Structures are given as C-alpha cells and as structure tokens.
A protein has these predicted regions:
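Conserved mixed alpha/beta catalytic, RNA-binding, or beta-rich assembly cores of soluble enzyme
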Residues: 2-7, 11-12, 17-57, 73, ...
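Glycine-rich phosphate/pyrophosphate-binding loop regions near the starts of catalytic domains
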Residues: 58-69
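Short Gly/Pro-enriched loop/turn and capping motifs at secondary-structure junctions
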Residues: 251-253
Length: 296
C-alpha cells in the first residue's frame, strides 16, 4: 500500500472513560436493534455519552449461548457519577425494553472502578428485583411484563482514547457511501475499536458563533462554500465531499490499527482522491498523532 495521496498532517484525540458491555438476545434482529439503538446519538462533544458497536458474536461465543453484540459507551472527562447517569438512559430505554435481552460487563482489563447497576437500572423493578448467580456472574433480575430482564451487578469503568479520525476526500456520493461502509466494516474487525459516528458528514471545529448549540460546521471544509469563501476555503481541486470516520478505542495501539485498516480499505475505492484528518492546531484534543506515522 502506498500513501502518496495521504496528507502529512496530524489528528487530535483525548482520553476518555468507557464501559464495554455485551448485549445478548434470542435473535440477531433483537440484538442488533438493542446494540444500535443504545449506541446511537453520539453526544460526548456536548458532555453526554456516545457509543458504538464493536463486534457481533455467535451463540457459541457468549456466556448464555445466545446471539451477542459487544458495545462500548464513552464519556470524556472524569465525572463518573454523570457517566453512570447518562449511561442509565441507554441501558433502560434502549435495551431493557427489548424483549428477552440481557447485559453483561465485558471489560477487557482489571479496572477497580465500577458503575453499580442496581441504583441506575436494577430499581426499574420497583423494589421487586433480586440478585441471582448465573453464567458465573452476579446478575440483577428485573421483573418485567415479558419476563425477565437481567443485567450484571457491576460494570467496570476503563480508560481509553477518543476522537481518533481520518477524512477521506471524495469525488462522488458513491465513494462516500461505499468506501465509508467498507471502512466501518474494517474497523469492526479490530478488537477494542468503535466508530461512534459511522460515516460522519459534518466535521466540526473548536470555534463557533453559536456556543449554545455545541460544535458547528467546519466551514472552510464545506464544498458548497468553496466559491463563497474564495482563498479561505481549504477544499481541494476535484473534492466534492469530505466525510469523516471517528475512532474510539481501548488503547492507542487499537486506535492506530483501526485507523490504518479503515484508511487502507478506503483507498481502494474509485472516487476517493485523498486522505486527511482533523488538525485543529491543538485546540481540540490534548494528544496528537501523525497520520503517516500510523499508516507506514
């Protein structure tokens, strides 16, 4: 693989806290709905939780012998209480309500920091919930109308890396969608990595004229503003679309592996004419990583 169409630039990332969980269910459809619903609405940039699907598992790969999905939920910063509060919405409103689902802690390290699930999810049983020991774990059994929902008693909180990214510069809509889908699939083959926005069509910037609504468009990279901005535009010749893939991962090694896998497969597609990344002169993330250093 050659990288002559990759810009020599860096992207910015930052540390974050995450919970890695396993959702199981009786059918692939129920598991996919629970996984995608609970990890939608990436919101870390506005101080809330974002998530992603890491991998789907077959029946023989899960503790209870059912279909499974490994998912991650992330929050920037150190406010564990807020993390638990925000996470509880995802677990209760997107998974508990799906029939016959179950959630396990699926942490990949021995962290001693936990989220206690009884207070934020277990008490959905309104005091009728109880603890059972099944699948080699302590599970909270929550009685519900379609019996019954179970969730592991404690989930470990881990620290990882958020916001790794690359942009793939495209001539056509087909390139945006086809190359992007292939990149997401390649990232899902990397253990410990997720793409919380999947194909992201709206790269943002640290500065904004409207701080009350959070990050706003990175105007100098908007193809529709190229003529209006003139020399201030940073949209290159022949570039009509600039989608972004964002990567969160359990560690820097996994982030780098996922980024390389995504870029490599993207460059194989007709209509992809270059690769760049979100370089904000250090204003967004406190960690910087050179794109070419990772790829070569």
């Amino acid at each position: 693989m050659t990288y002559e169409n990759v810009e020599d630039t860096f992207f910015e990332a930052f540390e974050g806290k995450y919970v890695r969980a396993l959702i199981t269910g009786p059918t692939e459809e129920i598991v996919k709905r629970a996984a995608y619903d609970s990890t939608s609405t990436p919101s870390a940039v506005i101080g809330r939780v974002e998530g992603g699907v890491e991998k789907f598992l077959d029946k023989n790969e899960t503790p209870d012998g059912r279909y499974g999905a490994i998912v991650q939920y992330w929050l920037g910063g150190d406010d564990v209480e807020k993390f638990a509060f925000e996470l509880s919405y995802r677990l209760r409103q997107d998974i508990l309500v799906k029939p016959f689902t179950r959630i396990f802690d699926y942490s990949n390290n021995g962290s001693e920091e936990y989220v206690e699930m009884m207070d934020i999810v277990g008490h959905c049983g309104d005091g009728y919930e109880w603890i059972v020991e099944e699948y080699g774990r302590k599970m909270i059994n929550v009685p519900i109308a379609v019996p019954d929902f179970q969730i592991e008693e404690k989930f470990r909180i881990n620290e990882g890396i958020m916001g790794g990214n690359f942009w793939y510069l495209c001539e056509s809509q087909e390139a945006v969608l086809n190359a992007g889908r292939a990149a997401i699939d390649a990232i899902m083959d990397v253990e410990g990595a997720i793409a919380p926005f999947e194909i992201c069509s709206a790269a943002s910037k640290p500065e904004t004229n409207y701080p009350e609504i959070g990050p706003t468009t990175n105007h100098v990279y908007c193809p529709s503003l190229k003529e209006k901005l003139g020399n201030d535009s940073k949209v290159g010749e022949g570039v009509n679309y600039i989608p972004e893939i964002v990567i969160n991962a359990v560690d820097v090694e996994s982030m780098n592996k996922a980024l390389k896998s995504g870029v490599d497969v993207t460059l194989d597609f007709e209509g992809v004419i270059g690769i760049s990344a979100g370089n904000y002169d250090g204003k967004l993330g406190d960690k910087t990583y050179n794109l070419l250093d990772i790829l070569k």
